Amino acid sequence: MAGRGKAIGAGAAKKATSRSSKAGLQFPVGRIARFLKAGKYAERVGAGAPVYLAAVLEYLAAEVLELAGNAARDNKKTRIVPRHIQLAVRNDEELTKLLGGATIASGGVMPNIHQHLLPKKAGSSKASTVDDDDN
């Protein structure tokens, strides 16, 4: 009965590989799977669901951090603070739609001056006075 059972003198057991590294992700697939099971979102959780969810969360985090890093660089800062995350999210149309109801602590408000409060354009008033003089 060759090929059955453990071979004598077999090498050491294969080193365990995490599901995150198998999927090429940084986010923890095992932890997300545990949360999905403990949360009772469904009776059973498929094997691919936590991998997919981890990939989606990692993509969203990378997107927000990239935009926040750009906002920090625009403000000549080397550290991302909540204000930079707020500016990044609110200046992106899709992220604003996704996180519209979320409040970012210490994020501040978006700079906005109502059009009626802005000073009138000097060039447009000169053009109208020149036209009046010609008539």
From Swiss-Prot:
The keyword Acetylation does not apply. PROSITE patterns: HISTONE_H2A. SUPFAM superfamilies: Histone-fold (SSF47113). GO terms for cellular component: nucleosome; nucleus. Its main location: nucleus. GO terms for biological process: heterochromatin formation. The keyword DNA-binding applies. InterPro entries: Histone-fold, Histone_H2A, Histone_H2A/H2B/H3, Histone_H2A_C, Histone_H2A_CS. This is Probable histone H2A.1. Keywords: Chromosome, DNA-binding, Nucleosome core, Nucleus. It comes from the Eukaryota. It comes from Oryza sativa subsp. japonica (Rice). It is found in: Nucleus; Chromosome. Belongs to the histone H2A family. The lineage of its organism: Eukaryota, Viridiplantae, Streptophyta, Embryophyta, Tracheophyta. Pfam families: Histone, Histone_H2A_C. Core component of nucleosome. Nucleosomes wrap and compact DNA into chromatin, limiting DNA accessibility to the cellular machineries which require DNA as a template. Histones thereby play a central role in transcription regulation, DNA repair, DNA replication and chromosomal stability. DNA accessibility is regulated via a complex set of post-translational modifications of histones, also called histone code, and nucleosome remodeling. GO terms for molecular function: DNA binding; protein heterodimerization activity; structural constituent of chromatin.
